[in-house]
Curated annotation (Swiss-Prot):
Subunit details: Homodimer.
Lineage, top ranks: Bacteria, Bacillati, Bacillota, Clostridia, Eubacteriales
Keywords, comma-separated and alphabetical: Aminoacyl-tRNA synthetase, ATP-binding, Cytoplasm, Ligase, Nucleotide-binding, Protein biosynthesis, RNA-binding
Reactions catalysed, as given in the entry: tRNA(Tyr) + L-tyrosine + ATP = L-tyrosyl-tRNA(Tyr) + AMP + diphosphate + H(+)
Motif position, 'KMSKS' region: 228-232
Organism encoding this protein: Clostridium beijerinckii (strain ATCC 51743 / NCIMB 8052)
Name of the gene: tyrS
GO molecular function, one term: ATP binding
PROSITE patterns the UniProt entry points to: AA_TRNA_LIGASE_I, S4
A single GO cellular-component term on record: cytosol
Domain called S4 RNA-binding: residue spans: 340-404
InterPro entries in UniProt: aa-tRNA-synth_I_CS, aa-tRNA-synth_Ic, Rossmann-like_a/b/a_fold, S4_RNA-bd_sf, SYY-like_C, Tyr-tRNA-ligase, Tyr-tRNA-ligase_bac-type, Tyr-tRNA-ligase_bac_1
E.C. numbers: 6.1.1.1
Record protein name field: Tyrosine--tRNA ligase
Residue numbers binding L-tyrosine: Y35, Y168, Q172
Xref: Pfam families: SYY_C-terminal, tRNA-synt_1b
Length: 406
């Protein structure tokens, strides 16, 4: 029988283990309960969360039971990991609104029927803790000296770390202990930026409960240059269609760099790895076919098959000259002009009367390339922008132009 760990490793999910051999044996011999925490600092999940949910879904498909832990309690404190300044504190009402919204989204990705998965909120136990009891029962197991060496604290010490935030590691560690006692949860999964907090939880369960506990981190979603994916210049790529439309969501994946196609197919779809490798090996114009598969599959998972088809058809109509696009004015440029600022190209081809007018258009949010809003006046026209030999420019609500290479 195949071990789900092998599939997770093959797809590139796993970055670090606390106990690799123990984890392998446990997943081979038992159907375990594991958890991933989600921070409710917004009323929607974004693509950074989606990779964690795919991690959960692969584990669930292999027969293991996930707990999706929403941090309604820890959000009252704020996670200092990866932050250079203290987070803005949310009200209880804001947090509860976000928790309710995220719960609805999660139920689309993870099967919670018949006890196959559990939704939990750490506010249920953290908000009613007695502080003195907590210090005696949990604080005694943590070394301040060791905590100060954790990466999540080190980068904050120079600018100032509040005692409020310093408690976050204890609270997250206690989450693991609580879930271990209540659901026999033996494993935590999470992003690699949570490594220090996850180690704290594993050690607390092992010391306080004398039980099996381990953790593994999943790869953060980065592109070939090491930059976080799922972020646009305008902000996060949300899973909520009211925040990021299914079409814009589709177009984001349709426009990823060639070098990132195979990685995204492996991490963000359920396509078999043989097919992932075949698509990832395509070159030249053929890689556009792989990008269409990537965009369709991810949009289908997040927004459903109907919305994925609509997004695909809309994109095809725009680039194939569908009913509304059949008479789109087309300009041609020399290949040497690829790599120039889009404002220069548009001005030289008379798509815009002047670069000043183009800057105004961008600043007002009225210019898009291939369905994606241009956020900065220094946007460069790249080779990746050419889909099926053309770039579609939209000005305002109804004005379109195509740019093709001579």
């Amino acid at each position: 029988m195949a071990n789900v760990l092998d599939e997770l490793l093959e797809r590139g999910y796993i970055k670090q283990f606390t106990h690799e051999e123990e984890t392998r044996k446990l997943l081979e011999n038992e159907k375990i309960t594991f958890y991933i925490g989600f921070d409710p600092t917004a009323d929607s999940l974004h693509v950074g969360h989606f990779i964690a949910m795919m991690f959960m879904a692969h584990m669930q498909r292999a027969g293991h039971r996930p707990i999706a832990l929403i941090g309604g309690g820890t959000a009252m404190v704020g996670d200092p990991s990866g932050k250079t300044d203290m987070r803005k504190m949310l009200t209880k009402e804001d947090i509860q609104h976000n928790v309710d919204s995220i719960k609805k989204q999660m139920e689309r990705f993870i099967d919670f029927s018949d006890g196959k998965a559990i939704l939990a909120n750490n506010a249920d136990w953290l908000l009613n803790l007695n502080y003195v009891d907590f210090l005696r029962e949990v604080g005694v197991h943590f070394s301040v000296n060791r905590m100060l060496t954790a990466e999540c604290f080190k980068q904050r010490l120079e600018k100032g770390l509040s005692f409020l935030e310093f408690n976050y590691m204890l609270m997250q560690g206690y989450d693991f202990y609580e879930l271990n006692q209540k659901y026999n949860c033996k494993m935590q999964l999470g992003g690699d930026d949570q490594w220090s907090n996850m180690i704290a939880g594993v050690e607390l369960v092992r010391r306080k409960a004398q039980g099996e506990a381990m953790a593994m981190t999943c790869t953060l979603l980065t592109n070939s240059q090491g930059q976080k994916m799922g972020k646009t210049v305008g902000g996060a790529l949300w899973l909520d269609p009211a925040k990021t439309s299914p079409y814009d969501f589709y177009q984001y994946w349709r426009n990823v760099d060639d070098a990132d196609v195979e990685k995204c197919l492996a991490l963000l779809t359920f396509l078999p790895m043989d097919e992932v490798r075949r698509l990832g090996a395509l070159e030249g114009a053929e890689i556009n076919g792989a990008k269409k598969v990537l965009a369709y599959e991810i949009t289908k998972l997040v927004h459903g098959e109907e919305e994925a088809k609509k997004a695909e058809e809309a994109a095809t109509a725009l680039f194939a000259g569908g009913a509304d696009m059949s008479n789109v004015p087309t300009v041609t440029i020399a290949k040497e002009e690829i790599g120039l600022p889009i404002l220069d190209v548009m001005a030289s081809t008379k798509i815009i009367p002047s670069k000043k007018e183009g800057r105004r258009l961008i600043e007002q949010g009225g210019l898009s390339i291939n369905g994606v809003k241009v956020e900065g006046v220094n946007r460069i026209l790249t080779e990746e922008d050419f889909q099926d030999g053309a770039v579609l420019i939209k000005r305002g609500k109804k004005n379109y132009n195509k740019i093709e290479i001579k």
